[in-house]
């Protein structure tokens, strides 16, 4: 037995060293032949020896105790980790149940899938082309993937309305009665053409806003909202998109061949198609709103078509001299200032400014600026107060500087031709019965009286106005329009 003891001890030590080495711990022997359980570490096999070693003397018992302590510590750690493992195993069924519940994003994807499926189904229906024509503008706009416009990047994009919201038709009810098509606001009739033209220049070719849409966006910008204007504008855009869908539904209902097929579709496909149309209209309206808010074409309207310019006023002269008017009123005054005069041969154009004295008898006309060249050496012909005019060409009217005693007069060229005046509310001509309202009608006393005698002093210092289409406009004397 005594001979077997050392052999068993050696085998146990070797086995314990292998176990300890595999576990990553090392045993450390101390000279006082004691090893604490907490700080017991195992050495590697290359540095450890059996009994009789020169480094460690008679430490077999310590080696055995260290092995047991390490094993006990490992078992304790394993026991501590067991509850956590059990908790994970318990949570697995709950995780499976949670995964079955689809999140909000998954529901959106599902709705989009139904919308795409509904669109494919509708494309196979008869007379689908009529339904597609009703929303062609919105479809063409979305085909461009809403890339930023090269002409609409100026401005602060921080105030834009973001279009990352998906709308749903299920949140509102249908009412196909009492819907009227969009029209131009009455307050915008005088300027809608120039503002619409300026809006087209800053929009992408795929947007193509109409005159009525331009008037609608213009009206939004004139809302007087102290707080949260963008939120109110967004709500208005959503309501307008819903209104567009209802109008599309009414058009489809008026088509006898399409409506029965629409009624036969299941509700899921119906709502899918309506969601698709609603978001198309909303995305297009948001796009136009952001471009209009950045560039404000209502403050810088485009000139009218240069083809409408009368003879003699071609070139770089603007069609209208427009001042900024933040209140949204038409900048056309109701009283004209002056008009461009022509010679007998129609070769000269002069800038003139009316200076009415207190007695109302004399006028002083001034030479034009250096840009205008007088080609004729003849004397300046006096202006007529009441020319006979007819035709389609028109010129805006402007208010003049005059004293309280001087009457308001309309000045027009003496050249017979097509000349009329456009005021804020109506188009006025001075040929008698064709004019419904004529606030500038002159008395018979001044019919044959010349406004500028040949002895009038003409000085360049008096020139402070700008030549425009058929008239002279003085921005420094601009006042709010007065109703006739």
Swiss-Prot record:
Keyword Glycoprotein among UniProt keywords: yes
Glycan-bearing residues: 175
Compositionally biased spans, kind Low complexity: 402-413
Protein's cellular compartments: Secreted; Host nucleus
Keyword DNA damage: no
Keywords assigned by UniProt, alphabetized: Glycoprotein, Host nucleus, Secreted, Signal, Virulence
UniProt motif RxLR-dEER: location: 48-65
Biased composition (Polar residues): 327-346, 418-428
Residues of the signal peptide: 1-24
GO cellular component: extracellular region; host cell nucleus
Region annotated Disordered, chain positions: 324-463
Family: Belongs to the RxLR effector family.
Domain notes: The RxLR-dEER motif acts to carry the protein into the host cell cytoplasm through binding to cell surface phosphatidylinositol-3-phosphate.
Function as written in the Swiss-Prot or TrEMBL entry: Secreted effector that completely suppresses the host cell death induced by cell death-inducing proteins.
Listed name of the protein: Secreted RxLR effector protein 104
Annotated organism of origin: Plasmopara viticola
Lineage of producing organism: Eukaryota, Sar, Stramenopiles, Oomycota, Peronosporales
């Amino acid at each position: 037995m005594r001979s077997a003891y050392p052999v068993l001890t050696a085998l146990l030590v070797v086995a314990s060293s292998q176990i300890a080495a595999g576990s990553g711990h090392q045993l450390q022997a101390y000279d006082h032949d004691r090893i604490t359980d907490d700080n017991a570490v195992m050495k590697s096999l290359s540095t450890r020896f059996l009994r009789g070693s020169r480094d460690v003397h008679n430490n077999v018992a310590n080696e055995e105790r260290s092995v047991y302590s390490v094993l006990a510590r490992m078992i304790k750690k394993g026991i501590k980790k067991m509850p956590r493992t059990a908790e994970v195993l318990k949570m697995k069924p709950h995780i499976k149940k949670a995964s079955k519940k689809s999140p909000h994003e998954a529901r959106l994807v599902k709705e989009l899938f139904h919308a795409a499926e509904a669109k494919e189904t509708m494309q196979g229906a008869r007379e689908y082309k009529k339904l597609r024509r009703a929303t062609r503008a919105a479809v063409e706009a979305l085909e461009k993937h809403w890339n930023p416009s090269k002409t609409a990047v100026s401005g602060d994009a921080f105030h834009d309305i973001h279009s990352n919201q998906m709308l749903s038709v299920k949140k509102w009810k249908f009412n196909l009665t009492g819907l009227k098509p969009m029209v131009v606001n009455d307050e915008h009739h005088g300027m809608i053409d120039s503002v619409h033209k300026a809006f087209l220049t800053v929009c992408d070719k795929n947007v193509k806003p109409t005159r009525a849409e331009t008037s609608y966006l213009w009206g939004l910008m004139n809302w007087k909202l102290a707080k949260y204007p963008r939120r109110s504008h967004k709500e208005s855009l959503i309501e307008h998109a819903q209104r567009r869908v209802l109008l599309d539904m009414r058009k489809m209902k008026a088509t006898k061949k399409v409506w029965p097929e629409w009624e036969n579709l299941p509700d899921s496909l119906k709502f899918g198609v309506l969601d698709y149309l609603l978001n198309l209209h909303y995305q297009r309206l948001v796009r136009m709103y952001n471009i209009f808010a950045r560039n404000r074409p209502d403050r810088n309207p485009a000139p009218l078509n240069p083809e409408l310019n009368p003879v003699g006023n071609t070139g770089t002269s603007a069609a209208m001299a427009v001042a900024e008017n933040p209140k949204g009123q038409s900048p056309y005054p109701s009283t004209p200032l002056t008009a461009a005069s022509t010679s007998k041969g129609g070769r000269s154009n002069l800038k003139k400014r009316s200076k009415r004295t207190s007695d109302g008898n004399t006028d002083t006309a001034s030479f034009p600026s250096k840009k205008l060249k007088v080609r004729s050496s003849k004397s300046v012909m006096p202006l007529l107060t009441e020319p006979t005019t007819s035709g389609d060409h028109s010129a805006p009217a402007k208010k003049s500087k005059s004293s309280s005693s001087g009457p308001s007069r309309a000045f027009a060229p003496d050249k017979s031709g097509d000349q009329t005046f456009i005021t804020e509310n109506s188009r006025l001509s001075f040929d008698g019965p064709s004019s419904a309202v004529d606030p500038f009608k002159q008395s018979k006393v001044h019919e044959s009286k010349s406004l500028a005698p040949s002895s009038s002093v003409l000085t360049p210092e008096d020139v402070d106005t700008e030549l425009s289409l058929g008239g002279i406009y003085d921005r420094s004397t601009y006042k709010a329009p007065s109703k006739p």
